[in-house]
C-alpha cells in the first residue's frame, strides 16, 4: 500500500473537479481525500500501487469537461504521517494564500436542458437549473475558494432535496455550489408589477410575441430583447437606443434555426452549441425577397449576422414554455445599457437606464457580482478570431513562458476597455468593460479591478497604462497608489500579439488601428515597429496627413477624404472640383475645411489607418459618415469582398507612382508607405466612373503590398524575420489574409491574434507583459 499527496493547479474551481476526483477514486478502488485549497486542489490517494497509478491516469486523462489542468505535482508520503484512510472524502475547502484560477461562467448543459423540459422532473421549467457542469461561476463570486457561502447563492439555503443531491457522490449535483430548485432557489419577477415566477415568464413571452421590448436579467447582466422577425419592433428598439445602423445580436432557438439563416460549418457548429456560447459572426444565407424570417434591420447592409444560442435557462424558457404562446425562432438580444454605459447588472440600474427603452423588465434576485457581456467571435481561415472576449472566456489566463516573477495591473485602453492582472507568466484579461468616455463605465472598471485583485489575491507592484495623459484608464492607473508604467498604444498592441503567441524574440510589428497617442504627440495608427519586451523603435508608418475637425472626423470620413485630396493636389480650386465630382460635401463645407487645413485649425497630424479606410470609403461613395465605430471601414471591406467573389485575381497596377517598392523618407529616416499616391489613384479612377467595389478591392490589395514591402525593407535592415499583426484594422479579414499570405510568400513567420482581440480589447495584455519585463529589469 502506498500514499501519495497530489496537488493539481489550473481551472479546478467551479467545474466539478472534486466530485470527479471522488468518482475516479471510487472507480480505482482507493481511499483518501480531496480538498480545495484555493490556488490548487490537494488530493491524498491511498491504496495498492496499481490502483493509485490507475487513479492518476484517470485524473490526467479524464478531468471534468470544463477544467484546465496546468500542472500536477505528486509526492510520496508515509502512512504514519497522515494515517490510514478508511474511505474517500471531500474535505471542506481551506483558505490558502496564493494565486487562484477562476472559472468563467458555463452555458447550460444538455443534461440540465433535458431535466428542465421534463414534466416529471422536480426542476421542470426552473429558470436557474444548473449542476457541476454548468451555470454561473465568475459572475456570482464574492471570494475564493469557490464555495456557496462565498457566492451570491449564499442568500438561498438549500432545501432538503437539493442538500441531499449536493452531498451524494452519485449525483450530477454533488458539491455543485449554485445548486437550487423551484423551492429554494432565486425567483424571477417583473419590476414594478405583481407577476413573479411562472406568471412573470408568461407575461414576458406574451410581450415579446405581441411586438414589445423587454429587458431581461441573465447571467452577467441585462439584455434588451424583442422579436427579431418583427420589423416594427426592431425599428422601434433602434429608435429608442438611438442606434440607426449598428448590427444587433440575435439569439436563435437552436442550431437548426441558425442554419436556416446562416451558413454554418462544422467548427462553427461546435462552438455555437458548446459550453461558452459566444456570439458568432456568421455569413447570411441568400434569402428570397418575400422571406419572413430574420428581418433586414437586424444587421442592415451587413453580409453577416451576430448570432448565439441560449446559454442561461431563463433564455431557453423565452423560446419554449408550456403556456401555448408560439414564439419566434429569433430574438434580438442586445446588451442592456444606454449608449456608453456598462451593461446593467441590478434592478436600480435597470430602472434608471432601461425603463425608457422597454415595456417590461424581467429581473431575478440572484445578485451579479461581476458584469460579463457576451463574447463576440469571428472566423478566419476556419479558426476562431475573437472580437470581444468576455463571458465564457474571461478570466482564463494567457500563459507566457518567460522567466518572469512579479504581479502587475494593466488598466487597458480608453475604448473597448478590458484590464489585465499579471502574475509571473500568467495574465488574466478581464471581461469586457466598455468605453471609458462615460464615467459610469470608469466606475465599473474601478469596481471590477478591486474585485479581481481580491479574488486572485494579488498585490500589484506596478500599474501599467496607455501613454495618453488624458485617458480615463490612465487616471485609474494613477489612482492605484503604485508606480505607473506608461506604454505607447501601438507597442502594446504588438506585445499583446507576441504574448498570445508566446513569442519571446524581436518582431516587426504592424499595428494598424484608428487612433493612438504617439511618442511625438501626434496621432499614430498605421505603424511599422521593431519591438520586443524591452522596447520598440518606430521604423515606418503610412504617409502622415492632417486630421481636421477633432473627434468628429472619426465619424465623418469625408473630412479626412478632403484633407487627403488637398494634400495631393496642393491646390484649392482643383481640390474643390474633385470634391464636387465625388459629391463628398457642399462647397461651403469644403471651403471651411480647406481654410482650417491652411491654418492647421483644430487639426492634428495623423497616421491613422482607420481614418484612411474611412476616407477611402467616402471617396468611393460607399459611406461618407459613420453612425457607429468602424461603419465606413466595414462597408469598404464588404464592397471589396463582394468584388473578390466575382474575380480570381486583379493584376491592374495603380500606377507607377504607387509602386510599393518606392518610398518616401522623413528626416529621421522613417520608412513612409506612400498611401497618398494610392489616394490619388483611387480619386482619379472614381471620377472616371470605375466601379466602387473594384476600387475598394484594389485599395486593400495595394495597401497590403505597401505593408509587405515595408516589412521586407525592415528585414533587410534588421535581419528580423517575424511579423506580428495587431490593431483593430486587422479585424478586416480581407486585409489580414492579403497581408498574411503575402508575407508568407516572402518567407516571413507571421503572428496574428486568435482568442485575444486584435482591437483595443486586447492591449491590456500587452501593457501587462511590458510591465512584467519592467519589473525584471528593475527600472
Where are each of the predicted segments found?
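Intrinsically disordered, low-complexity, mixed-charge
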Residues: 1-178, 182, 189
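Internal gly/pro-rich beta-alpha loop/helix module
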Residues: 62, 165, 323, 327-402, ...
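A phosphate-binding glycine/aspartate-rich beta-alpha loop in the early core of alpha/beta enzymes
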Residues: 76, 159, 221-286
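A contiguous, well-structured pocket-lining segment that forms one wall/lid of small-molecule binding clefts
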Residues: 178, 185-187, 413-451, 563-720, ...
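Short glycine-rich phosphate-binding loop at a beta-alpha junction
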Residues: 215, 457-469, 718-729
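Conserved phosphate-binding catalytic cores of ATP/NTP-utilizing and phosphoryl-transfer enzymes
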Residues: 259-265, 317, 343-348, 374-375, ...
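Conserved phosphate-binding/catalytic loops in two-lobed NTP-binding clefts
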Residues: 466, 481-493, 721-724, 733, ...
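Glycine-rich phosphate-binding/hydrolytic loop that grips phosphoryl groups
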Residues: 491-512, 516-518, 557-566, 701, ...
Amino acid at each position: 500500500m502506498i500514499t501519495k499527496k497530489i496537488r493539481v493547479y489550473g481551472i479546478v474551481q467551479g467545474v466539478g473537479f472534486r466530485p470527479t476526483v471522488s468518482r475516479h477514486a471510487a472507480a480505482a478502488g482507493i481511499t483518501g481525500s480531496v480538498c480545495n485549497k484555493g490556488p490548487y486542489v490537494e488530493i491524498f490517494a491511498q491504496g495498492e500501487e496499481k490502483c493509485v497509478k490507475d487513479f492518476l491516469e484517470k485524473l490526467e486523462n479524464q478531468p471534468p469537461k470544463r477544467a484546465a489542468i496546468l500542472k500536477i505535482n505528486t509526492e510520496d508520503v508515509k502512512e504514519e504521517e497522515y494515517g490510514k484512510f478508511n474511505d474517500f472524502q471531500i474535505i471542506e475547502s481551506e483558505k490558502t494564500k496564493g494565486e487562484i484560477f477562476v472559472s468563467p461562467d458555463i452555458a447550460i448543459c444538455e443534461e440540465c436542458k433535458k431535466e428542465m423540459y421534463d414534466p416529471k422532473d422536480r426542476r421542470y421549467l426552473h429558470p436557474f437549473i444548473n449542476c457541476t457542469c454548468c451555470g454561473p461561476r465568475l459572475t456570482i463570486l464574492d471570494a475564493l475558494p469557490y464555495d456557496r457561502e462565498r457566492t451570491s447563492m449564499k442568500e438561498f439555503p438549500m432545501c432538503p432535496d437539493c442538500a441531499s443531491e449536493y452531498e451524494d457522490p452519485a449525483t450530477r449535483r454533488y458539491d455543485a455550489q449554485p445548486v437550487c430548485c423551484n423551492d429554494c432557489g432565486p425567483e424571477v419577477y417583473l419590476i414594478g408589477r405583481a407577476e413573479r415566477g411562472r406568471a412573470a415568464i408568461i407575461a414576458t413571452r406574451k410581450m415579446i410575441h405581441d411586438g414589445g421590448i423587454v429587458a431581461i436579467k441573465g447571467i452577467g447582466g441585462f439584455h434588451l430583447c424583442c422579436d427579431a422577425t418583427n420589423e416594427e419592433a426592431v425599428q422601434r428598439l433602434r429608435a429608442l437606443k438611438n442606434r440607426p445602423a449598428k448590427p444587433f445580436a440575435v439569439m436563435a432557438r437552436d442550431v437548426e434555426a441558425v442554419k436556416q439563416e446562416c451558413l454554418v460549418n462544422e467548427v462553427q457548429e461546435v462552438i455555437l452549441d458548446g459550453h461558452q456560447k459566444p456570439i458568432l459572426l456568421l455569413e447570411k444565407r441568400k434569402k428570397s425577397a418575400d422571406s419572413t424570417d430574420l428581418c433586414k434591420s437586424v444587421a442592415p447592409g451587413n453580409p453577416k449576422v451576430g448570432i448565439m444560442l441560449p446559454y442561461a435557462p431563463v433564455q431557453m424558457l423565452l423560446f419554449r414554455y408550456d403556456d401555448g404562446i408560439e414564439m419566434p425562432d429569433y430574438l434580438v438580444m442586445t446588451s442592456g445599457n444606454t449608449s456608453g454605459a456598462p451593461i446593467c447588472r441590478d434592478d436600480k440600474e435597470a430602472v434608471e437606464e432601461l425603463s425608457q427603452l422597454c415595456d417590461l423588465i424581467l429581473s431575478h434576485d440572484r445578485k451579479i457580482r461581476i458584469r460579463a457581456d457576451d463574447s463576440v467571435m469571428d472566423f478566419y481561415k476556419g479558426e476562431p478570431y475573437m472580437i470581444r472576449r468576455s463571458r465564457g472566456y474571461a478570466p482564463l489566463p494567457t500563459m507566457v513562458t518567460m522567466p518572469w516573477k512579479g504581479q502587475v495591473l494593466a488598466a487597458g485602453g480608453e475604448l473597448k476597455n478590458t484590464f489585465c492582472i499579471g502574475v509571473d507568466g500568467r495574465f488574466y484579461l478581464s471581461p469586457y468593460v466598455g468605453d471609458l468616455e462615460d464615467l459610469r463605465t470608469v466606475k465599473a472598471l474601478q469596481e471590477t479591478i478591486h474585485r479581481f485583485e481580491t479574488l486572485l489575491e494579488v498585490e500589484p507592484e506596478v500599474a501599467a497604462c496607455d501613454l495618453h495623459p488624458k485617458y480615463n484608464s490612465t487616471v485609474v492607473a494613477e489612482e492605484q497608489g503604485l508606480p505607473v508604467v506608461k506604454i505607447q498604444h501601438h507597442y502594446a498592441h504588438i506585445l499583446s500579439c507576441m504574448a498570445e503567441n508566446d513569442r519571446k524574440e524581436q518582431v516587426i510589428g504592424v499595428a494598424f488601428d484608428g487612433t493612438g497617442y504617439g511618442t511625438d504627440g501626434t496621432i499614430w495608427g498605421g505603424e511599422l515597429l521593431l519591438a520586443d519586451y524591452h522596447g520598440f523603435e518606430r521604423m515606418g508608418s503610412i504617409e502622415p496627413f492632417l486630421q481636421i475637425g477633432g473627434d468628429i472626423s472619426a465619424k465623418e470620413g469625408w473630412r479626412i477624404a478632403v484633407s487627403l485630396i488637398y494634400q495631393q493636389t496642393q491646390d484649392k480650386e482643383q481640390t474643390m472640383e474633385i470634391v464636387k465630382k465625388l459629391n463628398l460635401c457642399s462647397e461651403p463645407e469644403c471651403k471651411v475645411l480647406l481654410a482650417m487645413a491652411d491654418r492647421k485649425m483644430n487639426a492634428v497630424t495623423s497616421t491613422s489607418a482607420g481614418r484612411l479606410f474611412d476616407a477611402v470609403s467616402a471617396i468611393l461613395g460607399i459611406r461618407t459618415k459613420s453612425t457607429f465605430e468602424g461603419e465606413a471601414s466595414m462597408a469598404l471591406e464588404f464592397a471589396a469582398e463582394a468584388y473578390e467573389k466575382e474575380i480570381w485575381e486583379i493584376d491592374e497596377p495603380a500606377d507607377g507612382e504607387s509602386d510599393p517598392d518606392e518610398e518616401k523618407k522623413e528626416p529621421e529616416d522613417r520608412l513612409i508607405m506612400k498611401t497618398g499616391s494610392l489616394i490619388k489613384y483611387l480619386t482619379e479612377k472614381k471620377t472616371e466612373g470605375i466601379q466602387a467595389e473594384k476600387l475598394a478591392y484594389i485599395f486593400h490589395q495595394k495597401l497590403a503590398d505597401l505593408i509587405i514591402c515595408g516589412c521586407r525593407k525592415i528585414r533587410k535592415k534588421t535581419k528580423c524575420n517575424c511579423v506580428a499583426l495587431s490593431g483593430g484594422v486587422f479585424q478586416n479579414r480581407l486585409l489580414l489574409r492579403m497581408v498574411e499570405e503575402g508575407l508568407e510568400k516572402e518567407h516571413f513567420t507571421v503572428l496574428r491574434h486568435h482568442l485575444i482581440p486584435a482591437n483595443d480589447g486586447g492591449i491590456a495584455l500587452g501593457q501587462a507583459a511590458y510591465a512584467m519585463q519592467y519589473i525584471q529589469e528593475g527600472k
